[in-house]
Amino acid sequence: TSGKDGSHTFSARLNTIFRECITGFDYAQNMVVIKTMPGLASAAASAIDAMNMSVVLGTLAGDDTVFVVMRDSNSAAAFCGEIRTLLN
């Protein structure tokens, strides 16, 4: 869901999917790369897409990697910060 300041918070579904399948993540400029357990990248990408976040321009999933294009580098950094918080 999106906050009134344009930030986003993870839904319970995304929280569960991420906790179960993410093995690593990082960003460069406006691009985020998420590594998952084999076969689970599509589930992670679908969960991100389902959130309809205005800062996410799109996702692309392989077998164990999700590529997320964010609107800008600040959004990518904030998104990775949320993932980090979620996984800790």
PLM regions: where:
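Short, basic/aromatic recognition patches that contact phosphate-bearing ligands
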Residues: T1
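Non-DNA-binding regulatory cores of transcription-related proteins
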Residues: K4-C80, R84-L86
